[in-house]
Amino acid sequence: MAQSTEDNTRRPRPSDLPEMFRPPVNRAMRVLDRSFFKKTVPLSAATIFKNSDISRVRRALEQSKDILALPRLNTIQDIKQDDVVKKCLLLKETIRHDDTATWSPTINELVDNGVVGVGPFDLTLDYDYWLHSDIISAVLPEELLEEVPQGFTQVGHVAQLNLREQFIPWRHLIAQVLLDKNPTLRTVIRKTEDVGSQSEFRTFPYELLAGDSDMNVIQHEQDCEFRFDFSRVYWNSRLHTEHQRLVDLFKPGEMVCDVMAGVGPFAIPAGKKKIFVWANDLNPHGYEVMQDAVKRNKVFKFVTPFNQDGRSFIRWSARALQKYDPVTVTIQPRTKRTRDASGQVKETQPPLEVYTRPKVFHHYVMNLPGNALEFLDAFIGVYAGCEELFEPHTKEQLPMVHVYCFSGHSENEVDDHIDICKRMSERLEYPITVEDRVGGAGNTELELSIHNVRLVSPNKQMFCASFRLPRAVAFRKK
């Protein structure tokens, strides 16, 4: 089942229910017993004698704040009196049917006028009522309640839990409750080792915690659909805003080289924006998925997948693009329909859109944060002998390079930026410093920016460094 994951990292808010409405506690539970979570709460209710009065009584009691205010609970309930089922409104827990001193003037007036009667009502709450956080808080030891695990990353129907060591004994219980409380989920897994620890394809070993073992997912992002086996490719739903941020930098008709494209989270949306992309990935399954995504999302005129090593692809693609036959894509925009002042429909046919694939790349994307910086030396001499393709001989500038990387997490990020610049300089054999950033006093031709993508862990930050490939690097003769 296809599902959009616009909010991919779900963090249910812990319940702030009053004590009497919280679930029963069993801190010895290790295997989920749903039947244990059942509770009867004695309340009072205002029984409405005529159904025609339900709406006005409800409005009156809402205004007087006498109605029970519990999330996810219908305050209108059935109540049986003398074998006749009537409607009643649940009253807040401080109101007692046998103590008129707890009644508000509104309740007194409704009773005096014979509109309602106030009596006892036993409210039954069960497992289905409470949130994931309510149930988990009722089974974990008290010393762990400050950090109840609630967040997860969703990819299609699969939830990926990242649990700290102290929660491992309850992992299956936590996962089963998560599955029960989220109808779009069918599978819950836990990563047992870091991404890429056992595979060069950035996959990870995992443990199935709850649900079925099917890892073939359907994922939507930026109006594109991807279908893949999550156990065989890399996908991080937390990066959806970063994918969009970068794609928004590309202009229709530009040429992009996506060096480590994965299943295409940059390439496929870019193709939909009429941007030409050569998208490469080393993972054979990722390549197959990307081929499917190209067809499925109808971007085959703009996106071409490849299955090569990233380092060799950087050098090969720059030369191959010059030799390939020109590609021209003609698109007929949809007819525009408008109404004039008299109401008549007027049709306007926009002119044809014509895009010709460029002979040089405008952007390189290197989304392999673990070691993408190590590939930068492939740009040394990448356009050696091809100076005539760029300024001042043509209007084309050298490409922007967008390289993802990890660095330590410093308080003001200055140390991180210095570290990233140092590592880029070493691989490019060209000096890059933090002063070269846009707005700085350094080399303005670099157009350097370092974007903070996300905090991966307390001591690990993900960044995207963007810079224009220096002439001294691109044209260097080895």
UniProtKB/Swiss-Prot annotation:
GO terms for molecular function: tRNA (guanine(37)-N1)-methyltransferase activity; tRNA methyltransferase activity. Keywords: Cytoplasm, Methyltransferase, Mitochondrion, Nucleus, S-adenosyl-L-methionine, Transferase, tRNA processing. It catalyses: guanosine(37) in tRNA + S-adenosyl-L-methionine = N(1)-methylguanosine(37) in tRNA + S-adenosyl-L-homocysteine + H(+). It comes from the Eukaryota. Residues 7-16 have a biased composition (Basic and acidic residues). It is found in: Mitochondrion matrix; Nucleus; Cytoplasm. Its EC number is 2.1.1.228. S-adenosyl-L-methionine binds at residues 243, 281-282, 309-310, 367. It is an enzyme of class 2 (transferase). GO terms for cellular component: cytoplasm; mitochondrial matrix; nucleus. Residues 1-22 are annotated as: Disordered. GO terms for biological process: mitochondrial tRNA methylation; tRNA N1-guanine methylation. Its main location: mitochondrion. PANTHER family: TRNA (GUANINE(37)-N1)-METHYLTRANSFERASE, TRNA METHYLTRANSFERASE. Monomer. Belongs to the class I-like SAM-binding methyltransferase superfamily. TRM5/TYW2 family. Specifically methylates the N1 position of guanosine-37 in various cytoplasmic and mitochondrial tRNAs. Methylation is not dependent on the nature of the nucleoside 5' of the target nucleoside. This is the first step in the biosynthesis of wybutosine (yW), a modified base adjacent to the anticodon of tRNAs and required for accurate decoding. This is tRNA (guanine(37)-N(1))-methyltransferase.
